[in-house]
Amino acid sequence: MKQIYRLNSFIGLLLILFIGGLSSLAYAERIHLKIALLPDGKHKYFHELLDFAVKAAGHIPVIERAGYMPQNEIWKELLSGGITVHWFLQTPKRDSQLVPIRVPITGGLIGQRILLIPKGQQSTFNRVNSLKDFINLGKKAALGKMWFDVDVWRLNGLPVTTQDGDWRQIYHKVADSVTGFDYFPRGTNEIIEEAMLHPELEIERKLILVYDRDFIFYLSKDHARYQKILEESLEKIKDSGIMDNLIRKYWDAALSILRYDERTIIKLNTPVN
């Protein structure tokens, strides 16, 4: 399977380079990207996608890894130009403060939320068949203070507790049933690895909460010159199937384990700002 993926991706990249008329390396530019690392290798898909994008544009990627940073520090570094690029859920506020690359990059997986819950609590969630049922549970989602999901949950009438500072404290607070920390919504592309790292929690087996938003890349304003290059190249990668191949490479196994197609879908309204 990996050999097929590599062959398909390589062929797709060659086609992009050919179609784009980039056979000459005379115009190749060295694109320097300083990017943060995330715990548990969660950055790998996004780094590989950026590498493909720069190469597909006919340029040479020079990727500098800036080390591990929490999200609030990544945000500050992007605003100051200390790092070049990162991925966030797209919002108008972020669009105004940074330079958006307006190409969705996870196939919507990040907007499809599955719950981490304390062990032994599955029967509580088995009663849920609709958004109204979920609201009536009275359970509070545990979320990072500045996260977009806070706005999504509140818009849909779902109670929230926010964690200031290090959001990773949420795991043990949910496991310990700290008041207000009843469950932790995670992206379908994140939750399997997180559950393995936190065996005191379990993956809720019935529900999937879905809202219409995806990650996009954001550049610091100091690196706005890369916007057109990356936007056009990511569109080519998406159209060629390379992005889908990468998504399958990193997350197909997780989707199978999660029994994605058998879950009860609860659709959530999405804030406009």
Regions found by a protein language model. Give the residues of each.
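Acidic, polar ligand-binding/catalytic clefts
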Residues: 67-135, 145
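Periplasmic-binding protein-like
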Residues: 109-114, 121, 196-231, 253-273
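Extracytoplasmic small-molecule ligand-binding "clamshell" domains
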Residues: 28-99, 230
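Ligand-binding clefts/hinges and TM-proximal coupling segments of bilobed small-molecule sensing domains
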Residues: 144-155, 234-273
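Short helices/loops that flank or line small-molecule/ion binding pockets
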Residues: 52-56, 67-84, 155-156, 168-190
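Ligand-binding cleft/hinge of the Venus flytrap
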Residues: 49-62, 129-135, 145-168, 195-200
